[in-house]
Design a protein with these regions (language model features):
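Betabetaalpha-Me/HNH-type nuclease active-site subdomain
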Residues: 129-266
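Secretory targeting and sorting signals
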Residues: 1-34
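Short, charge/polar-rich alpha-helical segments
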Residues: 35-69
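Amphipathic alpha-helical coiled-coil segments
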Residues: 63, 87-116
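Extracellular/mature segments of secreted proteins
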Residues: 56-64, 112-124, 261-262
Length: 306
């Protein structure tokens, strides 16, 4: 709320920024700037990923409520108090706009990473995993630059002597997780005996656990994800969820997954050409979505991409 003068025998005059009466009225997340920053309800899986940003917005809005509850009528001898009151109002308005923008960027990233046609959720790391990731990230200098892409047919790798190797090992551990019969990109785990789209005249065999011999494949391997612009600038939580994003998982047969390794499907031989072309298109689509999510997460952190 904007401060006002109180004059004896005269009407009270509102300050120049009386519009803050509207801007500083916190209701729900979307109401602060409905024209440009309509932040919707925070639902799972975004709830965990964006929880700290939602809390930051709520904290600013609590300060706004406290500000608006403060007496705001000043007489002519209180010019300094009026100026301080209005300066605080302006600062809170700016803080709220920043908090809304950060939360919206996070929600947008979560929407990209957690596809509607997957039964796998985005989950934050454990505290122990978070600490390991932070320690690994700290080993990467600000002057480190990713290497050039490998030749077609060669694997994406993170050499043992490379600064991000510890980060790669931490992100690769237990990844992909055991997904059982999860639905990935709209496809249930293939049944035993189902046709293998990667190879003509082959079917999914039976694995030792009785399920089909199918693997949850990273469409874009973790080694390549680490080299995406801005990835190593993400927080440990954000790096963790990007490398485990439902968007980036698909079912492949054991044979196809073993043949693909950590390279592009373009380098595979002996596979169905139509399937290969579709996979190359899927890789291009997925890497664009991952980069978009990384950029949005960096924005939510307030981190300019190097």
């Amino acid at each position: 709320m904007r401060g006002t003068w109180g004059r004896r025998g005269a009407p009270r005059l509102a300050g120049a920024l009386v519009a803050l009466l509207v801007l500083l009225a916190p209701t729900d997340v979307a109401s602060a700037a409905p024209a440009t920053r309509a932040v919707g309800p925070v639902h799972a899986p975004a709830a965990d990923l964006c929880a700290s940003l939602e809390a930051a917005l709520q904290s600013v809005q609590a300060q706004i409520e406290q500000h608006n509850a403060t007496p705001n009528v000043f007489d002519e001898s209180q010019a300094a108090a009026l100026a301080a009151y209005d300066a605080e109002a302006a600062a809170l308005t700016a803080a709220q706009e920043t908090a809304i923008a950060n939360l919206q960027s996070c929600l947008d990233a979560a929407s990209l990473l957690a596809t509607d046609n997957s039964t796998v959720d985005l989950k934050p790391p454990t505290e122990k995993a978070r600490q390991v990731l932070q320690q690994a990230k700290d080993k990467i200098g600000n002057d480190w630059t990713p290497p050039a892409a490998p030749a077609v047919g060669k694997n994406w790798t993170v050499p043992k002597s490379s600064p991000p190797r510890a980060l790669y090992d931490a992100l690769r551990s237990g990844n992909p997780p055991e997904l059982g019969a999860a639905t990935l990109r709209g496809q249930a785990r293939p049944a035993v005996g189902a046709d293998d789209p990667a190879y003509a005249n082959r079917t999914f065999l039976t694995a030792a656990d009785g399920l089909s011999a199918a693997s949850a494949d990273h469409i874009i391997p973790i080694a390549r994800q680490i080299y995406l612009p801005g990835f190593v600038q993400l927080t440990p939580d954000n790096m963790y969820v990007v490398t485990r994003a439902p968007l980036n998982f698909q079912w492949l047969s054991f044979k196809a997954n073993l043949s693909k390794q950590s390279r592009s499907v373009a380098g595979m031989t002996g596979v169905d050409p139509r399937w290969q072309a579709e996979q190359i298109e899927l890789e291009d689509e997925t890497v664009r979505a991952l980069q978009d999510a990384i950029d949005r997460l960096l924005a939510s952190q307030g981190t300019p991409r190097r």
